[in-house]
Amino acid sequence: ILMVITAVASALLDNFTTMLLMTPISMQIGIALGINPLALIIPEVLASNVGGISTLVGTPTNILIGAYAGIGFNDFLINQTAGVILALVVMGGYVLYHYREEWRKRGGGISPRLYRKLEQNAEIEDTQALWKSGLVFGLVLVGFILGERVHMVPAVSALAGATLLLIWLNPNIHEMIKAVDWTTLVFFMALFMVVGAVQEVGLIGIAASAMSRIIGENLILGIFVIIFGVGTLSTTIANIPLTASMLPIVKFLSTSVPGANSLVLYYALSMGAAMGGNGFLIGGEANLVTAGITEQTDSPISFKEFLKVGLPVTYLTLAVGFLWLIIRF
């Protein structure tokens, strides 16, 4: 159930934010049930990385791909969701098998004292702000879905929602400006400058030509190379710069490989980048933020423990994603 909740939340928010919310909750649930909280948290991290693939806003890599290739919110939803659901089912089966002994240890129930503490922690401090934010969030999602019909890019819906919420909630503007993640914004600007420079000097063209010679006119081979190649690299390389570097290469292949004009290689890139992040603890932002939270508790996530679950899940889900893209396209 927690995996499903995490996957759905990651599709609507993003996996980084979802794990910030889910990790403390799962820690308390694990303690209440008398089991190792990591038996809940690690599957949630894996589900968050996969669940976000199904929408434009679910992962930073999808946002990059969507903006570069002109793929909209509905396109991701239609072409990726079924594959994501299949991957989550396979992942759930493996996780159930892996943690079967741990989950059998769960205690008989929650003590009244702990239950009261959980209730206190779950108490909503500002219900007005909650329902206002929920309403605006719903309107933004509607804008994502319907905006494509009037050729409105998703950024317009997001900015309109943010503006409306600022006016409605009237927060401290100075505090809001301080809260903006300027480091990430500057990182993205610098990243695209570097990718553009590499493209201008011809290095990306050389890489694209080499991959084109390997793939030839075989679309299935192209999907395989992209999804498994990017997925393997994403286990150790941050998937955002990797995706940004791969975009011009995928664009070249989409024009040279017969049948690739359906944008299937972009979807393969999306799946490979996100699913590959499950391989190692350093493979994704959600992994690292979750590890950082658990580091402050008695149940920190170790590199080895994450690897034992994450690496098999990575290649199982990559295989499911590969088969789905072949069926879909």
List the predicted regions and their residue ranges.
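Generic alpha-helical transmembrane segments of integral inner-membrane proteins
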Residues: 4, 8, 85-97, 134, ...
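Small-residue-rich segments of transmembrane alpha-helices in multi-pass membrane proteins
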Residues: 1, 44, 48-55, 113-121, ...
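Flexible hinge motifs at transmembrane-helix junctions and intramembrane kinks/re-entrant loops
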Residues: 127, 131, 139-159, 175
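Membrane-interfacial helix-loop connectors
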Residues: 9-45, 60-79, 181, 196-299
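Juxtamembrane and boundary regions of transmembrane helices in multi-pass small-molecule transporters
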Residues: 35-38, 42, 54-57, 74-125, ...
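Hydrophobic alpha-helical transmembrane segments
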Residues: 1-4, 18, 41-42, 77, ...
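Membrane-interface junctions of multi-pass transporters
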Residues: 117-122, 147-152, 167-222, 234
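Hydrophobic alpha-helical transmembrane segments in multi-pass integral membrane proteins
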Residues: 56-60, 139-145, 191-209, 276, ...
